[in-house]
Amino acid sequence: MCPRALWGIASPIALGYSNGANIAAAVLLLRPTELAGAILLRTTPPFAHPNPVKLDGVPVLIVSGARDPIIQPESAAKLASLLERYGAAVEHRVFPVGHELSQADVTLAQSWWNKQAPAMTNN
C-alpha cells in the first residue's frame, strides 16, 4: 500500500508549464499510478521511446501554442497520441499564441479542472 493511501490522501493532479509539464508527463510515463490526472501546458514528449504503461482513463489536458517557437504543436500532438495509446483520456487543444501562457489557457485549465477534479480526487 502506498503511503498516501495509509493517510487517506488522494493521488495528486499535476499542473505543469513548459519543462514543468514535461516533468509531469515523465511521471505519467514512469510512475503511471502516482497521478490522478494532469494539465500539461506547452509540453513535449519527455522520452524518445518510453516503455508502454497502463494509463486506464487517466484524464490529461494538453494545451499548445500554434505559434510556439520552442515546442511545436505537432510535438505535443505526438505526446497526446502516445498517452491515448496507453489508455489516457486526453484532450489536446491548440491556441493561436506562442510559448507564453494566455488567458485562454487559464480559462480552459480552470474549466477542465472543475469538470475533472471531483472524479480524480475520489480515488
Please provide the spans of the model-predicted regions.
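Gly/Ser-rich "nucleophile elbow"/oxyanion-hole loop immediately N-terminal to the catalytic nucleophile
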Residues: 1-13
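Primarily recognizes the serine-hydrolase "nucleophile elbow" in alpha/beta-hydrolase
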Residues: 10-56
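A short beta-to-alpha transition loop/helix N-cap that caps and shapes the active-site region
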Residues: 45-50, 70, 101-103
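Short beta-strand/loop motif that positions the catalytic acidic residue
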Residues: 56, 61-64, 68
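Acidic catalytic loop of the alpha/beta-hydrolase fold
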Residues: 66-74, 99-100
